[in-house]
Amino acid sequence: MLTIPEGILLCFITSGSVLGVLGNGFILHVNCTDCVRQKFSTTGFIFTGLAISRICVICIIISDGYLKLFSPHMVASDAHIIGISYLWIITNHTSTCFATILNLFYFLKIANFSHYIFFCLKRKLNTIFIFLLGCLFISWSVAFPQTVKIFNDKMKHRNTSWKFHLHKSKFIINHILLNLGVIFFCMVAIITSFLLIISLWKHNRKMQLYVSRFKSLNTEVHLKVMKVLISFIILLILHVIGILIETLSFLRYENKLLLILGLNFSSMYPCCHSFILILANNQLKQASLKALKQFKCHKKDKDVRET
């Protein structure tokens, strides 16, 4: 049985995950519709890949969390451990990769630096995207053998009570190698986010010097982008913290509260960031407002028919 705090946190994560799937599903629907109507754009490809991978990440986090809470015997099975590990590697690495590509895309499109390296990167935008997708496949090729190694180590020590403190350094090294791709993508995303924030901040300072009475429209847009980037960094850090908490709960099966807390933190990023993207992107925002209007009209028609 769950305690009251555990039950509240579980309800919170369940409702948040449903909203996260709906938000990412909406992004996927809008971009797939645009793909059918007109030529598939680079941003459409990025948003589609990001939405699909995040829906999968949310489903894996929730399903694995519920199994650990209510059916721990199923989680202990070898087939479940291997299966969920491979699915997690594919979806989590893919989600982080597409989020990094999206950040890099906005950085190269919006930022303004006079350094020649920045201009070289800007000219070779498609090449950089292909390079990052190549890094995604490399991260899979590193993570898959590492998963098998971790699983085999656990199988060897199954009958001799595998203890964390006896293999602390090995445990940390294995998990660093397992998440090497995610660490690389996160570093690139955070660095590009900070550089874009610096560029926008410098631009806003210049605008304040030249435009003292009237607020520039570009300044408002830049402030909105800065808020989106800061929220992205915060959510990404919470996601990493959540995964670390879940890893700690793996070592202490009796602590359900720690597991649910980790699930809440790790699911915030793929769930909340989708709504931030919808509000920040004009195309997605207009589509969401149109969908809300249609829903309200449908509800009114239904109420009229019932009366």
UniProtKB/Swiss-Prot annotation:
Transmembrane segments: 8-28, 42-62, 82-104, 125-145, 180-200, 228-248, 258-278
Keywords annotated in UniProt: G-protein coupled receptor, Glycoprotein, Membrane, Receptor, Sensory transduction, Taste, Transducer, Transmembrane, Transmembrane helix
Cross-referenced InterPro entries: TAS2R
KW Transmembrane helix (keyword) present: yes
SUPFAM superfamilies: Family A G protein-coupled receptor-like
List of glycosylated residues: 159
Source organism, top-level taxon: Eukaryota
Membrane topology: Multi-pass membrane protein
Sequence ranges on the Extracellular membrane side: 1-7, 63-81, 146-179, 249-257
Residues in compartment: Cytoplasmic: 29-41, 105-124, 201-227, 279-307
GO biological process: detection of chemical stimulus involved in sensory perception of bitter taste
Gene Ontology MF annotations: bitter taste receptor activity; G protein-coupled receptor activity
One cellular-component annotation, GO: membrane
Cellular localisation: Membrane
Function: Putative taste receptor which may play a role in the perception of bitterness.
Protein family: Belongs to the G-protein coupled receptor T2R family.
Misc remark: Several bitter taste receptors are expressed in a single taste receptor cell.
Protein name as annotated: Taste receptor type 2 member 106
